[in-house]
A protein has these predicted regions:
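Short glycine-/polar-rich loops that comprise or flank the Walker A/P-loop
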Residues: 4-5, 111, 139-142, 161-163
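Von Willebrand factor
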Residues: 2-61, 69-110, 113-117, 142-156, 167-177, ...
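VWA/integrin I-like adhesion module and closely mimicked acidic/polar interface patches used
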Residues: 102, 120-159
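Acidic/polar low-complexity segments with low predicted structural confidence
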Residues: 1-3, 67-68
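Short, well-ordered amphipathic alpha-helices
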Residues: 29-37, 89-100, 129-132
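Short beta-strand-loop
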Residues: 44-75, 154-160
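Von Willebrand factor A/integrin I-like adhesion domains
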Residues: 56, 150-201, 205-207
Length: 212
């Protein structure tokens, strides 16, 4: 079996994402999968996992090769908190279980990519701060955090990664541009793995703003 490039996507599904925002995310994800399937490098290496989090955290898609991937339904509750800390702990459990670290005889998977999207701030801040320490004990090629919409707070995300981006609006065209950019990140990861430990992020589109 060829070495996999695990891609973990964490999506905030708290009550405020209900309606157009989550529907737009679904369209963006669907377009991303379709684009990646057309890329021979991505098709050979990329495996996608989707974890949703609100009051509960669920891995709605375990790490799956693109050719076998069917996007599951993503549902938001009518209301509820954003347990980002619980989501990060859950992610680390999935990483420990799913990512092949390799052995002296056999190379393991490439270091995963992590994309986290939220439209708010962690409701479980103490858990979140502890979970960040745990995430940093795991190796990722890149961690990208996206703060979507006017109520999203970037300060907590900056503790997790330097790669924090904002989306000013939460409409379908903005999410589409964001997921097109995620697609390019995954494609680039598939091509540059083994050449360098950390890949440079491609330039984002105008709708996706880097937080300095």
């Amino acid at each position: 079996m060829s070495r996999r490039l695990p891609v973990y996507i964490l999506i905030d599904t708290s009550g405020s994402m209900k309606g157009e925002p989550i529907e737009s995310v679904k369209v963006g994800l669907s377009d991303m999968i379709a684009s990646l399937r057309l890329d021979p490098y991505a098709l050979e290496t990329a495996c996608i996992s989707i974890i949703t989090y609100d009051r509960e955290v669920k891995q709605i898609l375990p790490l799956t090769e693109l050719e076998n991937l069917q996007l599951p339904e993503i549902v938001c509750p009518d209301a509820g908190p954003t347990h980002t800390g619980a989501a990060l702990n859950f992610l680390c459990d999935c990483y420990d279980r799913e990512v092949n670290m390799g052995s002296r005889e056999q190379k393991g998977d490439w270091m995963p990519l992590l994309f986290l999207m939220t439209d708010g701030k962690p409701a479980d801040l103490m858990v979140y701060n502890e979970a960040i320490k745990r995430v940093k004990q795991h190796q990722f090629t890149n961690i990208v955090a996206c703060a979507a919409g006017p109520k999203a707070k970037t300060e907590p995300l900056k503790k997790l990664t330097d790669n924090v981006f904002t989306l000013d609006t939460m409409d379908s065209s903005t999410f589409k541009k964001f997921f097109q950019w995620v697609t390019i990140n995954v494609q680039q990861g598939g091509r540059t793995m083994g050449i360098s430990e950390q890949t440079e992020l491609p330039a984002p589109p105008a709708e996706v703003n880097l937080v300095v």
